[in-house]
């Protein structure tokens, strides 16, 4: 019965192929002793080998020739190791031809050794088991004693026996590991030594090969790279950086990164060219990055370093420094914005616009704390040169008669302003704040048509007719739409003259000794009606007193706002009841002579210039301090953005 049932497992084995073989070394008997003395003992251990894989049992010390281990291990069978046996069984051709000779890879070799404390371990015996013979007997567990033999070519001796249990198993989930293990077989001893040093086992493919198909590394596009990838994996692994697929968009590859990445993607030749590949041969953005991701499944994730962040923080300061440098320049007034907070606003710009819209007879008006650039100084010199152009242009320029009306109101104050403008050093404009109303078109026309006149040109035009002055006053009023002359417009223009100061209205004031009271001017034109004849004295006195009062305001550091053109008439009407109070306040300047007034004005001007220099020094210090803060610790400037000024 037993003889009939034995072939059935063999027939069943034709339909079942194992993937692993499990070997259990139980014990040995009759081993030769290697120690000296009467009771010879040995320190025995057994080396178990299938193909290129080896395992070793523990050492049983001082055994009398019968050690017991009871240790097991599992070996992975090479792909196709039992296919020949299966085909031979199906064809009844006997044993497979590869089962003997140099191609007999499916053998279990058991080598028993004696451990020597000094020198090389001594050989005790060797047993070779053909796995195909065991598999032919059936797939059940086989426990059997095998005789130990001497080394090939040595004299045969009695060396004892060893008992081993062999059982075949199958793991369906690891079928793809056959192909991977075949590619791992042709490894050099040098690579295995490196694996031991690195603490790696089979290139760490045991955990990943079970889920990868066997054709993953057989891509025809990869060519020799798929076959040589593991053989050269040790050399590439230390120098390989992250592939292009794992790099961030903000990180740029350096020369070393490009060379290492390109060298890891393309294999051209066996050996050295892999390690010394130039980055110019292939780009790190090539399509081979995808192949690299397939070959090396254990890619590190990209972590952004401080160099990526630092390259982004240092993109903005150069532009801010350029804007700050432009602010320090005299001709550039560009504002600097740091993190939404305006450090330098164009607040000094409105005085510059006033300077461009001021008519010729008036000095440039600017803020008391503003530092005038070169362009503003040149504009101030040109406006100072045109200081005495108010009374000129009666026949040459009819487009600006209203401005000439404003330039003939206080002769004494105008003369003091002229001499002061002549004595000022070059580049120091007269800084006063006056309620002036003029149009930019009139300024452009006056600058184009009026020639350069002297400082004392006013004395040649003291004979202007009162009717002509009234007509110009009506035109110079901002609210008048036409050039028509009427008594009402004439009186309105003279009333407007009361609200202005430092005007250049002609007055017969002696230049030898100025009088505190205005004198009626002499005119060569026919005299008009008596109401118009009485107004010049009142208007001149009012203009002089208001001018002195505003001079007091300027010297004390006050700043007067510029009235809009639409509010001029209302301002004239509201200032009429205050004329008496203005005269009382300006009475302390009546006893001063012309030279004393000029000296007082020059003294105040020097004080203002010193204050401007001090302000400029402070601004320069703040600029340098801000640049230093931006260079050293820019985080101090990260404040919440405020509303635009």
UniProtKB/Swiss-Prot annotation:
Swiss-Prot/TrEMBL keywords: Cytoplasm, Cytoplasmic vesicle, Endosome, Golgi apparatus, Membrane, Mitochondrion, Phosphoprotein, Protein transport, Transport
C2 domain location: 1-146
Chain intervals for the UniProt region annotation (Disordered): 271-299, 341-550
Signal peptide: none
InterPro entries per record: C2_dom, C2_domain_sf, FIP-RBD_C_sf, FIP_classI, Rab-bd_FIP-RBD
Modification note: Phosphorylated on serine and threonine residues. Phosphorylation at Ser-357 is PKA-dependent.
Protein name: Rab11 family-interacting protein 5
Pfam families: C2, RBD-FIP
Residues covered by the FIP-RBD domain: 578-640
Membrane topology note: Peripheral membrane protein
Phosphoprotein listed as a keyword: yes
UniProt-listed PANTHER family: RAB11 FAMILY-INTERACTING PROTEIN 5 (PTHR15746:SF14), RAB11-RELATED (PTHR15746)
Domain comment in the entry: Binds to vesicles enriched in neutral phospholipids via its C2 domain. The interaction is favored by Mg(2+) rather than Ca(2+).
Residues recorded with modification Phosphoserine: 176, 283, 286, 307, 357, 367, 391, 395, 486, 530, 539, 545, 640
């Amino acid at each position: 019965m037993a003889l009939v049932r034995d072939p059935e497992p063999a027939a069943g084995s034709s339909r079942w192929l194992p993937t692993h073989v499990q070997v259990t070394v139980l014990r040995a008997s009759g081993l030769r002793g290697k120690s000296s003395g009467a009771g010879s003992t040995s320190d025995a251990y057994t080396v178990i080998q299938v193909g290129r894989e080896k395992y070793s049992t523990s050492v049983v010390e001082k055994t009398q020739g019968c050690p017991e281990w009871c240790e097991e291990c599992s070996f992975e069978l090479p792909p196709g190791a039992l296919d020949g046996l299966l085909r031979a069984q199906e064809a009844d051709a006997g044993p497979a031809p590869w089962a003997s000779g140099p191609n007999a890879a499916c053998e279990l070799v058991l080598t028993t050794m004696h451990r020597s404390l000094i020198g090389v371990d001594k050989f005790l015996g060797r047993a070779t088991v053909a796995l195909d013979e065991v598999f032919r007997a059936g797939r059940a567990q086989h426990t059997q004693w095998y005789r130990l033999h001497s080394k090939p070519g040595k004299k045969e001796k009695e060396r004892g026996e060893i008992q081993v249990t062999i059982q075949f198993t199958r793991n369906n989930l690891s079928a793809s590991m056959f192909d991977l293990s075949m590619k791992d077989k042709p490894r050099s001893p040098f690579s295995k030594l490196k694996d031991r040093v690195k603490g790696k086992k089979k290139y760490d493919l045991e955990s990943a090969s079970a889920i990868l198909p066997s054709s993953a590394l057989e891509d025809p596009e990869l060519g020799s790279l798929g076959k040589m990838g593991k053989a050269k994996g040790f050399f590439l692994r230390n120098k390989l950086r992250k592939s292009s697929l794992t790099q961030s968009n903000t990180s740029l590859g350096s020369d070393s990164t490009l060379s290492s990445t390109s060298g890891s993607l393309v294999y051209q030749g066996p050996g050295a060219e892999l390690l010394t590949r130039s980055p110019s041969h292939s780009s790190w953005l090539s399509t081979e990055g995808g192949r690299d991701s397939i070959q090396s499944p254990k890619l590190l994730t990209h972590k952004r370093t401080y160099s990526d962040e630092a390259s982004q923080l240092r993109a903005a300061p150069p532009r801010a420094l350029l804007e700050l440098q432009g602010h320090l320049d005299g001709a550039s007034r560009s504002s600097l914005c740091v993190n939404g907070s305006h450090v330098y606003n164009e607040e000094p710009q409105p005085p510059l616009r006033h300077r461009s819209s001021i008519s010729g007879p008036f000095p440039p008006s600017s803020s008391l704390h503003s530092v005038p650039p070169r362009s503003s100084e040149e504009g101030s010199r040109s406006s100072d040169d045109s200081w005495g152009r108010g009374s000129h242009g009666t026949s040459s320029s009819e487009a600006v008669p209203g401005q000439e009306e404003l330039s003939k109101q206080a002769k004494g104050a105008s003369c003091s302003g002229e001499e002061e403008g002549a004595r000022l050093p070059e580049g120091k404009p007269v800084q006063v704040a006056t309620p002036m109303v003029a149009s930019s078109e009139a300024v452009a026309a006056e600058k184009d048509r009026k020639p350069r006149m002297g400082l004392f040109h006013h004395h040649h035009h003291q004979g202007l007719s009162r009717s002509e002055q009234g007509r110009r006053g009506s035109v110079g009023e901002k609210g008048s739409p036409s050039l028509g002359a009427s008594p009402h417009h004439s009186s309105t223009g003279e009333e407007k003259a009361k609200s202005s100061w430092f005007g250049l209205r002609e007055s017969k004031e002696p230049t030898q000794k100025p009088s505190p009271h205005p004198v009626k001017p002499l005119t060569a034109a026919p005299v008009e009606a008596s109401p118009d004849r009485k107004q010049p004295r009142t208007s001149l006195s009012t203009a002089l007193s208001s001018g002195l009062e505003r001079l007091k305001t300027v010297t004390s550091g006050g700043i007067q706002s510029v009235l809009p053109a639409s509010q001029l008439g209302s301002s004239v009407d509201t200032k009429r009841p205050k004329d008496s109070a203005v005269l009382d306040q300006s009475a302390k300047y009546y006893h001063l002579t012309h030279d004393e007034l000029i000296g007082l004005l020059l003294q105040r001007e020097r004080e203002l210039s010193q204050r401007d220099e001090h302000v400029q020094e402070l601004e320069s210090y703040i600029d340098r301090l801000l640049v230093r803060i931006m260079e050293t610790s820019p985080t101090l400037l990260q404040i919440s953005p405020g509303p635009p000024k």
